[in-house]
Swiss-Prot record:
This is HTH-type transcriptional regulator Rv3575c. It comes from Mycobacterium tuberculosis (strain ATCC 25618 / H37Rv). Residues 9-64 form the HTH lacI-type domain. Transcriptional regulator that negatively regulates transcription of the mce4 operon, which is involved in cholesterol transport and utilization. Acts by binding to the promoter region of the mce4 operon. It affects the utilization of host cholesterol as a carbon source, impacting the host's innate immune response. The keyword Iron-sulfur does not apply. Residues 11-30 bind DNA. Overexpression of the gene in M.smegmatis impairs the utilization of cholesterol as the sole carbon source by M.smegmatis, activates the host's innate immune response and triggers cell apoptosis. It comes from the Bacteria.
Length: 359
């Protein structure tokens, strides 16, 4: 006759074994600061002996209606979180705030490789207590799905005019206006601007006037307007700006865009870029084609990522790590007033070695 199998240990049986309350056992796993070190150690040692792994997280979630995690929504492939330096720093900042406040972090990728149905299901199925939405367009369909969840939401960068939602970002227009003013002050009059995508449709080409009037990504629109304003202030026709859009955010995207810009206007003496990854790629392309930076071409970026700074790129540095940290804090520790908060973080113009007077 086989021996009677031992019943699985439960929170109740562990409490009975130790002659303590169920709350004491629960606190040993979930709120250790509520117990003395000796008592917690005794609870954990007995739990190990009886084979009790801890409170069921699913049951706890159902009971407390808390998932204990933050959802980070980004309209990019998952690999973008780790390959783009600015995005990587941002994610690290969110993770830092989650760790400090005892929360988990769930990455919710709704990039273009997913169908609308799959992306919607990912947002609806995310077991989280709130969302940080990173840099999506005005017309992003998943933003509406996030809002339908009726959970706390913090938007980062864009969209900039979402009513009733807290946002963390920078003054993109002012930062780009200062950078463009610096380039124009060096004497440049034939400017090219390499931008990240302006809309959800796939384009990798020169940007016409109609598209420039109606981009759905606020950050890119504001940076373009910043360049226009600097050109106007310097007495340069803004319509002379050569703009090339890159849909894909790949290590080669800036080089491809630089080629298009120079073919469209061989008189260009400066290539401004709305991201450092575009600028670094453009510099690689120029070097491969015998165009010296900055002697023959000025190149500027935006973000201030470590590789850009190490290569002496003239750029705008923004606090991506701090931006992520503040977004997480605002979500997990919202103001007592319950009112949305708009935080505009400082940027810094970095005068590197890639900008000089036109040849």
């Amino acid at each position: 006759m086989s021996p009677t199998p031992r019943r699985r240990a439960t929170l109740a049986s562990l409490a009975a074994e130790l002659k303590v309350s169920r709350t004491t056992v629960s606190n040993a796993f979930n709120r250790p600061d509520q117990l003395s070190a000796d008592l917690r150690e005794r609870v954990l040692a007995t739990a190990k002996r009886l084979g009790y792994a801890g409170p069921d997280p699913v049951a706890r979630s159902l009971r407390t209606r808390k998932a204990g995690a933050v959802g980070l929504v980004m309209a990019e492939p998952l690999t973008y979180f780790f390959s783009d330096p600015a995005a990587r720093d941002f994610v690290a900042g969110v993770a830092q705030s989650c760790e400090e406040l005892g929360q988990g972090l769930q990455l919710v990728s709704v990039g273009s490789s997913r169908s609308l149905a799959d992306g919607t299901a990912a947002v609806l199925g995310a077991g989280v207590d709130g969302f940080v939405v990173y840099s999506v367009g005005d017309d992003d369909p998943y933003l509406q799905v996030v809002l339908q969840r009726r959970l706390p939401v913090v938007v980062v960068d864009q969209p900039k005019d979402l009513s009733g939602v807290s946002r963390v970002g920078i003054d993109d227009r002012a930062a780009m206006r200062e950078l463009a003013g610096y380039v124009l002050g060096l004497g440049h009059r034939e400017l090219g601007l390499l931008t990240m995508r302006l809309g959800r449709d796939r384009r990798q080409d020169l940007v016409d006037a109609e598209r420039l009037r109606s981009p759905t990504f606020d950050v890119q629109r504001e940076r373009i307007v910043g360049v226009w304003e600097a050109m106007t202030a310097a007495g340069v026709d803004p319509d002379s700006l050569t703009v090339v859009e890159s849909y894909e955010h790949l290590p080669t995207s800036g080089g491809t865009a630089a080629k298009v810009a120079l073919q469209a206007n061989p008189r260009l003496t400066a290539l401004m870029c709305t991201a450092d990854i575009l600028a670094l790629s453009a510099m690689d392309y120029l070097r491969a084609h015998g165009i010296y930076v900055p002697g023959q071409m000025t190149v500027t970026g935006f973000d201030g990522v470590p590789e850009a700074l190490s290569r002496g790129l003239t750029t705008v540095a923004q606090p991506s790590l701090h931006k992520g940290h503040r977004a997480g804090e605002l979500l997990l520790k919202p103001p007592r007033s319950g009112l949305p908060v708009i935080e505009v973080l400082d940027t810094e113009l970095v005068r590197g070695r890639t900008a000089g007077p036109p040849a």
